[in-house]
Amino acid sequence: MTKKSIPKSAKKVFEGILFDVYHWEQEMFDGTKRTFEAVKRIPTTQIIATTKEKKIIMLKEQQPHIGNFTSVPGGQVERTETPLHTTKKELLEECGMKAETLKLWKITNSGGKIDWESHYYFAQNCKQIKTPENNTAGEQIKMYELTFDEFILETQKPEFRNKMFQLEIYKMIKENTLKDFKNLIFN
Protein backbone atom coordinates (compact mmCIF):
# COMPACT_ATOMS: atom_id res chain seq x y z
CA MET A 1 0.00 0.00 0.00
CA THR A 2 1.21 3.50 -0.84
CA LYS A 3 1.82 5.90 2.03
CA LYS A 4 -1.09 8.26 2.65
CA SER A 5 -0.42 11.83 1.60
CA ILE A 6 -2.52 13.70 4.19
CA PRO A 7 -1.09 14.04 7.72
CA LYS A 8 -3.37 13.68 10.77
CA SER A 9 -2.76 17.34 11.62
CA ALA A 10 -4.38 18.50 8.35
CA LYS A 11 -7.62 20.50 8.48
CA LYS A 12 -10.52 19.82 6.12
CA VAL A 13 -11.26 23.11 4.34
CA PHE A 14 -13.87 21.81 1.87
CA GLU A 15 -16.17 18.79 1.76
CA GLY A 16 -17.46 17.84 -1.67
CA ILE A 17 -19.47 14.98 -3.12
CA LEU A 18 -16.43 12.87 -4.05
CA PHE A 19 -13.48 14.93 -2.83
CA ASP A 20 -12.52 16.66 0.41
CA VAL A 21 -9.75 19.28 0.40
CA TYR A 22 -7.20 19.43 3.25
CA HIS A 23 -4.59 22.05 4.24
CA TRP A 24 -1.69 21.80 6.68
CA GLU A 25 1.42 23.70 7.69
CA GLN A 26 4.66 22.00 6.70
CA GLU A 27 8.09 22.98 7.95
CA MET A 28 10.63 23.36 5.16
CA PHE A 29 14.30 22.35 5.32
CA ASP A 30 15.33 25.97 6.00
CA GLY A 31 12.93 26.25 8.98
CA THR A 32 10.25 28.31 7.21
CA LYS A 33 6.68 27.05 6.97
CA ARG A 34 4.35 26.65 3.99
CA THR A 35 0.74 25.59 3.61
CA PHE A 36 0.33 22.33 1.73
CA GLU A 37 -2.84 21.01 0.12
CA ALA A 38 -4.14 17.59 -0.89
CA VAL A 39 -7.48 16.02 -1.71
CA LYS A 40 -9.05 12.87 -0.35
CA ARG A 41 -11.40 10.98 -2.63
CA ILE A 42 -14.06 8.68 -1.22
CA PRO A 43 -12.84 5.07 -1.51
CA THR A 44 -13.83 2.69 -4.28
CA THR A 45 -14.14 -1.06 -4.62
CA GLN A 46 -13.05 -3.18 -7.57
CA ILE A 47 -14.40 -6.72 -7.84
CA ILE A 48 -12.69 -9.61 -9.60
CA ALA A 49 -15.81 -11.76 -9.84
CA THR A 50 -15.64 -15.40 -10.95
CA THR A 51 -18.19 -18.06 -11.79
CA LYS A 52 -18.20 -21.78 -10.96
CA GLU A 53 -17.23 -22.32 -14.63
CA LYS A 54 -13.92 -20.46 -14.00
CA LYS A 55 -14.95 -17.36 -15.95
CA ILE A 56 -14.30 -13.77 -14.89
CA ILE A 57 -17.02 -11.11 -15.09
CA MET A 58 -16.27 -7.93 -17.05
CA LEU A 59 -18.44 -4.94 -17.85
CA LYS A 60 -18.86 -2.77 -20.94
CA GLU A 61 -20.08 0.56 -19.63
CA GLN A 62 -21.21 3.91 -20.87
CA GLN A 63 -21.64 7.02 -18.75
CA PRO A 64 -22.79 10.44 -20.04
CA HIS A 65 -19.63 12.32 -19.02
CA ILE A 66 -17.11 9.56 -19.85
CA GLY A 67 -18.36 7.64 -22.89
CA ASN A 68 -17.60 3.95 -23.45
CA PHE A 69 -15.15 1.90 -21.39
CA THR A 70 -14.60 -1.57 -19.94
CA SER A 71 -14.15 -2.39 -16.27
CA VAL A 72 -14.58 -4.93 -13.54
CA PRO A 73 -17.66 -4.49 -11.33
CA GLY A 74 -17.28 -2.01 -8.49
CA GLY A 75 -18.18 1.43 -7.30
CA GLN A 76 -17.84 4.26 -4.84
CA VAL A 77 -18.00 3.55 -1.11
CA GLU A 78 -20.71 5.86 0.21
CA ARG A 79 -19.70 7.75 3.35
CA THR A 80 -22.13 5.64 5.42
CA GLU A 81 -20.96 2.25 4.01
CA THR A 82 -18.00 -0.07 4.44
CA PRO A 83 -16.02 -1.30 1.42
CA LEU A 84 -17.35 -4.83 1.98
CA HIS A 85 -20.96 -3.61 2.00
CA THR A 86 -20.34 -1.63 -1.21
CA THR A 87 -18.75 -4.68 -2.83
CA LYS A 88 -21.81 -6.83 -2.13
CA LYS A 89 -24.17 -4.04 -3.23
CA GLU A 90 -22.34 -3.31 -6.51
CA LEU A 91 -22.05 -6.99 -7.43
CA LEU A 92 -25.80 -7.35 -6.94
CA GLU A 93 -26.76 -4.10 -8.69
CA GLU A 94 -24.40 -4.28 -11.68
CA CYS A 95 -24.40 -8.05 -12.23
CA GLY A 96 -27.41 -9.40 -10.31
CA MET A 97 -24.97 -11.79 -8.61
CA LYS A 98 -24.06 -12.97 -5.14
CA ALA A 99 -20.64 -14.46 -4.31
CA GLU A 100 -20.16 -17.73 -2.46
CA THR A 101 -16.94 -16.28 -1.02
CA LEU A 102 -15.66 -12.69 -0.80
CA LYS A 103 -11.97 -12.10 -0.04
CA LEU A 104 -10.14 -8.80 0.26
CA TRP A 105 -7.11 -9.07 -2.02
CA LYS A 106 -5.45 -5.69 -1.49
CA ILE A 107 -5.97 -2.02 -0.80
CA THR A 108 -4.11 0.48 -2.97
CA ASN A 109 -3.71 4.21 -2.47
CA SER A 110 -2.83 6.52 -5.32
CA GLY A 111 -0.62 8.62 -3.04
CA GLY A 112 0.75 12.02 -3.96
CA LYS A 113 -1.66 14.94 -3.76
CA ILE A 114 -4.71 12.67 -4.19
CA ASP A 115 -5.44 10.25 -1.36
CA TRP A 116 -7.64 7.59 -3.00
CA GLU A 117 -8.04 4.10 -1.57
CA SER A 118 -9.23 1.32 -3.84
CA HIS A 119 -10.30 -1.95 -2.22
CA TYR A 120 -9.89 -5.03 -4.45
CA TYR A 121 -12.03 -8.06 -3.69
CA PHE A 122 -12.17 -11.56 -5.12
CA ALA A 123 -15.83 -12.57 -5.42
CA GLN A 124 -15.63 -16.31 -6.00
CA ASN A 125 -18.24 -18.69 -7.45
CA CYS A 126 -20.74 -15.94 -8.20
CA LYS A 127 -24.28 -16.97 -8.92
CA GLN A 128 -27.03 -15.04 -10.71
CA ILE A 129 -29.85 -14.34 -8.23
CA LYS A 130 -31.70 -11.47 -9.91
CA THR A 131 -31.83 -9.26 -12.98
CA PRO A 132 -29.05 -6.63 -12.89
CA GLU A 133 -30.01 -2.97 -12.39
CA ASN A 134 -27.56 -1.99 -15.09
CA ASN A 135 -29.43 0.48 -17.28
CA THR A 136 -29.99 3.63 -15.24
CA ALA A 137 -30.00 7.32 -16.10
CA GLY A 138 -26.32 7.56 -15.15
CA GLU A 139 -24.86 4.37 -16.61
CA GLN A 140 -25.51 1.68 -19.18
CA ILE A 141 -23.83 -1.65 -18.39
CA LYS A 142 -23.46 -4.87 -20.34
CA MET A 143 -21.96 -7.83 -18.47
CA TYR A 144 -19.83 -10.49 -20.19
CA GLU A 145 -17.64 -13.43 -19.14
CA LEU A 146 -14.03 -14.14 -20.08
CA THR A 147 -11.47 -16.85 -19.50
CA PHE A 148 -8.48 -15.86 -17.36
CA ASP A 149 -6.23 -15.29 -20.40
CA GLU A 150 -8.93 -13.22 -22.15
CA PHE A 151 -9.39 -11.20 -18.95
CA ILE A 152 -5.67 -10.39 -18.77
CA LEU A 153 -5.69 -9.21 -22.40
CA GLU A 154 -8.84 -7.13 -21.82
CA THR A 155 -7.31 -5.32 -18.83
CA GLN A 156 -4.36 -4.20 -20.97
CA LYS A 157 -6.49 -2.39 -23.57
CA PRO A 158 -6.70 1.43 -23.58
CA GLU A 159 -10.47 1.40 -22.94
CA PHE A 160 -10.02 -0.46 -19.62
CA ARG A 161 -10.89 2.24 -17.09
CA ASN A 162 -9.05 1.21 -13.92
CA LYS A 163 -5.48 2.29 -14.64
CA MET A 164 -4.18 1.31 -11.17
CA PHE A 165 -5.42 -2.26 -11.69
CA GLN A 166 -3.99 -2.19 -15.21
CA LEU A 167 -0.58 -1.40 -13.69
CA GLU A 168 -0.96 -4.27 -11.18
CA ILE A 169 -1.60 -6.70 -14.06
CA TYR A 170 1.29 -5.27 -16.07
CA LYS A 171 3.58 -5.75 -13.05
CA MET A 172 2.47 -9.40 -12.75
CA ILE A 173 3.14 -9.94 -16.45
CA LYS A 174 6.62 -8.44 -16.09
CA GLU A 175 7.40 -10.43 -12.91
CA ASN A 176 5.93 -13.63 -14.36
CA THR A 177 3.48 -14.04 -11.45
CA LEU A 178 0.19 -14.32 -13.38
CA LYS A 179 -0.08 -18.01 -12.47
CA ASP A 180 -0.03 -17.09 -8.76
CA PHE A 181 -2.70 -14.44 -9.39
CA LYS A 182 -4.86 -16.98 -11.23
CA ASN A 183 -4.60 -19.36 -8.26
CA LEU A 184 -5.64 -16.55 -5.89
CA ILE A 185 -8.67 -15.69 -8.01
CA PHE A 186 -10.02 -19.22 -8.36
CA ASN A 187 -8.90 -20.86 -5.07
Where are these regions (language model features)?
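Active-site-adjacent beta-strand/loop module that shapes the phosphate/pyrophosphate-binding cleft
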Residues: 22-30, 111-130, 144
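Short loop segments at secondary-structure junctions
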Residues: 27-30, 51-55, 62, 124-128, ...
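Conserved Nudix-box catalytic region and its N-terminal flanking loop in Nudix hydrolases
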Residues: 2, 45-89, 137
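Acidic, metal-coordinating catalytic segment for phosphate/diphosphate chemistry
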Residues: 9-48, 52-53
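Nudix hydrolase/Nudix homology domain
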Residues: 2, 68, 79, 113, ...
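Extended interaction-bearing regions that mediate binding to partners or small molecules
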Residues: 1-11
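Short, solvent-exposed loop/turn elements at beta->coil junctions and helix N-caps
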Residues: 11-12, 105-111
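The catalytic Nudix box helix
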Residues: 71-106, 121, 135-138, 147
